[in-house]
Amino acid sequence: MKKLALLVSGSGTNMQAIMDACASGEINGRIAVVISSNHEAYALVRAEGAKIPNYVCCKKDYPSAEARDREILRLLKMYDVDYVIL
């Protein structure tokens, strides 16, 4: 089973479709982590409800784009993801 990371910024309707496909076996994987660029993204609520680890990496919270990118990479490595889905 592959570990997926989802990068989200909005309501999470695509994320919900992926969650459903994983649950039904249509996708042989599980969502290991959700990373949002938006503190207000409803996708974070969906992730919380499904007990999926989730983080916000908003560019205003970092001194540079490179610092934010390093944090995203750190999270991807921490969860040992196989695929990143945008």
Residue ranges, per PLM feature:
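One-carbon transfer enzymes
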Residues: 1-86
